[in-house]
Design a protein with these regions (language model features):
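ABC ATP-binding cassette signature C-motif
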Residues: 1-200
């Protein structure tokens, strides 16, 4: 039986008089991890926004299975809780709100210390604030990860940790990164945006 997966069918998108995609088709397989490549301005981030429902498209169809959860790394740095630990726990389901172990494991993996957990999220540098958002994303355990330049601001140990996490992640991944070594080490396929289409 065919497992229902996210699917793009005959997708077309123009932007400012320029055609980014024309009749693009994509059907992900379970566990597939795709590295998306293409020159700047080719539409990689726009494709992410279309999948997330944040950007309209001219024609075609985006099919997302019911209850299929897509997670993406937010660049907006808005924090409401007094400590890093409590901020990250916000994303947990109500019955897991106090499962700090799950949160702490992710925070430690991304370079936070035990002392950091009780600090104000706003007291950290922009790079570490992005990591807090990355922890919040990973803690939600989505079916699919859309990661746009997730290696920015990461030091070597955190990079290694994220690499291991993505490799072990059981869901689907589409990744945009300029770090080709990182991409090659975590993806199963590379897909290019070329001549207004997607090519594996």
């Amino acid at each position: 039986m065919d497992i229902q997966m996210i699917q793009l069918t005959n997708l077309s998108k123009s932007f400012g008089g320029q055609t980014l995609f024309q009749d693009v088709n994509l059907k992900l397989s379970p566990g597939q991890k795709i590295g998306l490549v293409g020159r700047n301005g080719s539409g990689k981030s726009t494709l992410f926004k279309i999948i997330l429902g944040e950007e309209s498209y001219d024609s075609g169809d985006v099919s997302i299975p019911k209850n299929y959860m897509i997670g993406t790394l937010k660049q907006h740095l808005v924090f409401t809780e007094p400590t890093v630990r409590e901020e990250c726990a916000l994303v947990l389901p109500e019955d897991e709100q106090w499962n700090f172990y799950k949160i702490e494991k992710l925070l430690f993996g991304l370079g936070f210390t035990a002392e950091d957990l009780d600090k104000d999220p706003m007291s950290f540098s922009g790079g570490y604030q992005i990591r807090i958002n990355l922890v919040k994303l990973l803690a939600t355990e989505p079916n699919m990860l859309l990661l746009d330049e997730p290696t920015n601001y990461l030091d070597l140990p955190s990079l290694r940790w994220l690499k291991g996490f993505i490799k072990e992640f059981e869901g689907e991944v589409i990744l945009i990164t300029h770090d080709r070594d990182f991409m090659d080490s975590v993806t199963t396929h590379t897909m290019g945006i070329q001549r207004k289409g997607l090519r594996l």
